[in-house]
C-alpha cells in the first residue's frame, strides 16, 4: 500500500467538486478593479484542483507516508545533526503566551517572550564563550553572512578597506565560500594535510594584509578536531584578520569546549540542528550569531536589553549593519531551543557530546573493515568513509546510497566533503540506540558483500521504492516545474 503510485492532486480534480462552502458575504463586496491595476488581475480563472476534503486528506496522508523523517527512522545525514526533537519542545512552543503574540505588540505586553529571548541569549553566550549574541539570523547560511558582514563593518570602521579575502579550508561547507561571496569577499582556499586538518604551512602562505577572516568548522567536516586551533588563531590575528566559527558541528563539543576559548571572534549556531528545532523540511531554522566585544557595535539592530524596568529593544545603534531579518528572528524555533537547553542542563549537554562521539566512533570502527577509512584516527560526532574499494568493482557511492533506501534508511551524505573520493559522511547523533546503529551497520556490511558477490543488485537499486532512478540529466536540463493540463482527447 505504502509504495503504490500516487496521482497528482490535479489529476484527482473533478469539475464542480467542492471541499468547503463559504458563508454568505456579510460585508460590502469590494471589486478587484477598485483595488488592483488591470495588469495584476487574471483574465481567466486559475486552474486550481477541485477536490473534496476527503480527497485532500487521503492525498496528502498518502504522500506523507512516503516521507522519511527522524520520527520514522534512522537519519544519518552527515553534518546535518538529524537528532530526535523532544516533543516537550512542541508543547512549550504552543503556549498561548508564545504562539498567539505578534511582533508589533507593545513591549510591555510581551515581557515573558522577551525574557525567554534574553535568557536564551545568555545561555548561548555561556555555551560559546562569546560576549553577546543576536537571535535575528534565520538559519545557518544567513548566520554566516551576518557574521561576515559584521567582520566587514569592523574592518571598514578601522579604515582597513583592503581586507577583501576570506580563507576557507578545502573541506569547508559549501555555504562558507557562498556566504563570503554574497558578503562581497573573495574566497581563498587553504589545503588540508595528510591528517585531514588545516595545513599550517599553507595557512601561513595564504594569510596576508588582505585577509579579512578565516572561516572554520571545529571539528571539521571530516569529523576531526582541529588540534592546532590556538596556533591557527594566532596566525590569523597576527595578520589582522578575524576567526569565524561555523557552528554546524557544535554537537561535538557541547559543554566540552567553547569557540570563544579557542580564539574565535564570531560564531553562528544552528539551533534547528544542535538544539533540536525540527528541520529537514525546508525550515524554519534559527542561526544566532555571537561575537567578541570589539564587534558588538556592528550587531544588527535592535538588540535586546534588560534594565530595572524590564526588557526592551534598543534601536539606537549608529554603527549597526542594520536589520538582517524582519522583527526579532524565528521566535518559535528559539522557544524550542530554549526548552531543550533548560531541560538538558549543563550535565545533559555534556552527555549529548559524549554519546554523539561514542556513537560515531563505534560505527566507524565496525564499518572500517568493509569500506576505506581515509583518516584512521579518533573522530568526533561524525566520520567519513570512502567507496573507492567498491568503485573499483563497478559500484559507485551513489549506488550504495540508493540501496540503503530498500532497507528503509535515509542515506548518509555522499560526495561531500569534496576532498574525499567517493565520500560517505555519517553522523549518527546521540539520540540513537546501539540497536539502531547495529541495524544500519549490518545493512552497510550486507551492501559491501553484495558489491563483491552480486553487484547488479546494488547498481540497479532501489528496488522497493515507488520511484526508482530519476533521469538526473533531464531533470537538470529540462525540469518540469508546473502542472500542464492534458490536451482534450479528440473523438
UniProtKB/Swiss-Prot annotation:
Its EC number is 1.4.4.2. Pfam families: GcvP2_C (PF21478), GDC-P (PF02347). It catalyses: N(6)-[(R)-lipoyl]-L-lysyl-[glycine-cleavage complex H protein] + glycine + H(+) = N(6)-[(R)-S(8)-aminomethyldihydrolipoyl]-L-lysyl-[glycine-cleavage complex H protein] + CO2. GO terms for cellular component: cytosol; glycine cleavage complex. GO terms for biological process: glycine decarboxylation via glycine cleavage system. PANTHER family: GLYCINE DEHYDROGENASE (DECARBOXYLATING), MITOCHONDRIAL, GLYCINE DEHYDROGENASE, DECARBOXYLATING. This is Probable glycine dehydrogenase (decarboxylating) subunit 2. The lineage of its organism: Bacteria, Bacillati, Bacillota, Bacilli, Bacillales.
Amino acid at each position: 500500500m505504502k509504495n503504490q503510485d500516487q496521482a497528482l492532486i490535479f489529476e484527482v480534480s473533478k469539475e464542480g467538486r467542492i471541499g468547503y462552502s463559504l458563508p454568505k458575504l456579510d460585508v460590502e463586496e469590494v471589486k478587484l478593479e477598485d483595488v488592483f491595476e488591470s495588469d495584476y488581475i487574471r483574465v481567466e480563472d486559475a486552474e486550481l484542483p477541485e477536490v473534496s476534503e476527503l480527497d485532500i486528506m487521503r492525498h496528502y496522508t498518502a504522500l506523507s507516508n512516503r516521507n522519511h523523517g527522524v520520527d520514522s527512522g534512522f537519519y544519518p545525514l552527515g553534518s546535518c545533526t538529524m537528532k530526535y526533537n523532544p516533543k516537550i519542545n512542541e508543547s512549550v512552543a504552543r503556549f498561548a503566551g508564545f504562539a498567539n503574540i505578534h511582533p508589533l505588540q507593545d513591549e510591555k505586553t510581551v515581557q515573558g517572550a522577551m525574557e525567554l529571548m534574553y535568557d536564551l541569549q545568555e545561555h548561548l553566550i555561556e555555551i560559546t564563550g562569546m560576549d553577546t549574541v543576536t537571535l535575528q539570523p534565520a538559519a545557518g547560511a544567513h548566520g554566516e553572512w551576518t557574521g561576515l558582514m559584521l567582520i566587514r563593518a569592523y574592518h571598514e570602521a578601522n579604515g582597513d578597506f583592503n581586507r577583501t579575502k576570506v580563507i576557507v579550508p578545502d573541506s569547508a561547507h559549501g555555504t562558507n565560500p557562498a556566504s563570503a561571496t554574497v558578503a562581497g569577499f573573495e574566497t581563498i582556499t587553504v589545503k588540508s594535510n595528510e591528517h585531514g586538518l588545516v595545513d599550517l604551512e599553507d595557512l601561513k602562505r595564504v594569510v596576508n594584509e588582505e585577509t579579512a577572516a578565516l572561516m572554520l568548522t571545529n571539528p571539521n567536516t571530516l569529523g576531526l578536531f582541529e588540534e592546532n586551533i590556538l596556533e591557527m588563531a594566532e596566525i590569523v590575528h597576527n595578520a589582522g584578520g578575524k576567526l569565524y566559527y561555523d557552528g554546524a558541528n557544535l554537537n561535538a563539543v557541547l559543554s566540552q569546549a567553547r569557540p570563544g576559548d579557542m580564539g574565535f571572534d564570531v560564531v553562528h549556531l544552528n539551533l534547528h540542528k544542535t538544539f533540536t528545532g525540527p528541520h529537514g523540511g525546508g525550515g524554519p531554522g534559527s542561526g544566532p550569531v555571537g561575537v567578541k566585544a570589539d564587534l558588538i557595535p556592528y550587531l544588527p539592530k535592535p538588540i535586546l536589553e534588560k534594565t530595572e524596568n524590564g526588557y526592551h529593544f534598543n534601536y539606537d545603534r549608529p554603527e549597526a549593519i542594520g536589520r538582517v531579518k524582519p522583527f526579532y528572528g524565528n521566535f518559535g524555533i528559539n522557544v524550542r531551543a530554549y526548552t531543550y537547553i533548560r531541560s538538558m542542563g549543563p550535565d545533559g549537554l555534556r552527555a549529548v557530546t559524549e554519546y554523539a562521539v561514542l556513537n560515531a566512533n563505534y560505527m566507524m570502527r565496525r564499518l572500517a573493515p568493509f569500506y576505506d577509512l581515509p583518516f584512521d584516527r579518533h573522530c568526533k560526532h561524525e566520520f567519513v568513509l570512502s567507496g573507492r574499494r567498491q568503485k573499483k568493482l563497478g559500484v559507485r557511492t551513489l549506488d550504495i546510497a540508493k540501496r540503503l533506501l530498500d532497507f528503509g534508511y535515509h542515506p548518509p551524505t555522499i560526495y561531500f566533503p569534496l576532498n574525499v573520493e567517493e565520500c560517505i559522511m555519517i553522523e549518527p547523533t546521540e539520540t540513537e540506540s546501539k540497536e539502531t546503529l547495529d541495524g544500519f551497520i549490518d545493512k552497510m556490511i550486507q551492501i559491501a558483500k553484495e558489491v563483491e558477490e552480486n553487484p547488479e543488485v546494488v547498481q540497479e537499486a532501489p528496488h522497493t521504492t515507488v520511484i526508482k532512478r530519476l533521469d538526473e540529466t533531464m531533470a537538470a536540463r529540462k525540469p518540469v516545474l508546473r502542472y500542464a493540463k492534458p490536451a482534450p482527447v479528440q473523438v
